């Protein structure tokens, strides 16, 4: 019977050129996989995410990252059907404060659909958040009760990202590794270089940790090769925000390594903030007088990060932020609706802030911030929920790290925390939670942190 159905479906696909039906065998395989070994399917989604592509220029344009997002949506539907059948919820996860913040944030996103300037756009945006969070946080979080799942999430993503990096470097080499071509050579796996750099930075702490753990000589060479590959890929991504985020992650690692207490950390932060406040005029003069623009020269490229007078990328970012703040001032409490910024910000631009890369169209990106974007789209509560989410991720993770026994799990929690540091520091300048490449990393590591938060002990090894 199955053979007849498959043959019939193939005939329809070929005869009527209905290409979507070609997904039927793949969908059947995924459904079978979900019923018989859900945990490995979740890991397969993690592994396939860096290699998924968006088919925008083809007749089969669904606006999704394939096959990752289709699989995530299918897993969400599977979870819903399973709940209707079994009536069971993952109460250990639901009872955690981190989970409750995530659900309340989702609830606020859903509530603001009622006031959205583009309700259908906001509904789709909320729906995509749901199909990222349910498989990667709730389902994968449940699967992490098994040690082998916890151990494989980062290597599965990192090695697949390594394949994408080899492709990217190969294409990039044909253009002399120039800065100009670095923005698109990672296509079709990553839309542009900032997203690619974010992913590289997120898994980079894991690649360092993998070098130092006890392992065979063969695996040590494999991990060394991956580390070197990711390092080269990071350098030639020309992503300044990714480089900055790794500096921040390194500083946080030193806090753990040197066992700096919360009181000492607060004192350091107060001294640093006071120093910046007292010297703000000098810093502004440095920023405004810096005319170094991004280029192939790595030294100049790093210096250009503080150029707010002539660097087009920096000025456009300031233009997007200013537009977002004006949108928030216009609708301070409920915002314009999730996912609407790129379609609504154009009238809020000022001619004096426009750059040669500015646009009035809706296809050129978002607010370039995980903080200011929610402010414009969801009102001031949107920013509050982001701050609460970050706070609970790190509060849960730091508490778990201190409680877990030294060993594999403790190291994984540290890697997850450092990955989160890279993301949220990068999030000052870009935002990717609405895309599978970023969402899978953030929510799978949050699931690991949540597991550690409710776990009593770690595994030595």
Where are these regions (language model features)?
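A membrane-periplasm/extracellular boundary helix in multi-pass inner-membrane enzymes
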Residues: 15, 169-175, 232, 236, ...
